[in-house]
From Swiss-Prot:
Forms part of the ribosomal stalk which helps the ribosome interact with GTP-bound translation factors. GO terms for cellular component: large ribosomal subunit. Disulfide bonds: none annotated. Part of the ribosomal stalk of the 50S ribosomal subunit. Interacts with L10 and the large rRNA to form the base of the stalk. L10 forms an elongated spine to which L12 dimers bind in a sequential fashion forming a multimeric L10(L12)X complex. This is Large ribosomal subunit protein uL11. Belongs to the universal ribosomal protein uL11 family. It holds the Pfam family Ribosomal_L11_N. The gene is rpl11. GO terms for biological process: translation. PANTHER family: 60S RIBOSOMAL PROTEIN L12 (PTHR11661), LARGE RIBOSOMAL SUBUNIT PROTEIN UL11M (PTHR11661:SF1). It comes from Methanobrevibacter smithii (strain ATCC 35061 / DSM 861 / OCM 144 / PS). Residues 138-160 have a biased composition (Basic and acidic residues). GO terms for molecular function: large ribosomal subunit rRNA binding; structural constituent of ribosome.
Amino acid sequence: MAKDTVEILIEGGSATPGPPLGPALGPFGINMMQVVEEINNKSADFAGMKVPVKVSIDRDTKEFEIEIGTPPTTSLIMEELGIEKASHEPGADIVADLPIDKALKIARMKFDSLLANDYKAGVKEVMGTCVSMGLSVDGKDPREAQKDVDAGKYDDVLVE
């Protein structure tokens, strides 16, 4: 029962049987349309962003498993805010403001790869990334917003 793994980078939600997927998976003789459909379903949340995809194929049974990685937190934040670059001077130059609901959305997208045990801690991790990007969170310094999360100010938004 030999398994092969193919790792590729695709645009979320828009994989096609053509390159880079087709040439990489074609030699294994698996149903390409089934693979493409599953990749597109699993990566739909990351539409427009490059996402790492890992396809594990059993050579004997032609069965496959698809694992979708997540883009870096900085990429998700920039996509949500529609900005192209973070600040060159994060402490002095604030380039955008991340609303708490978008911080929660990003924390949910990244939750499996974050170190957080719950969404509250995940949102704080996303806010920590905002510090190094030169962003404010809900109009405040991200460190202040993290303190507000600890104090329970956003509990109504952060409910499961």
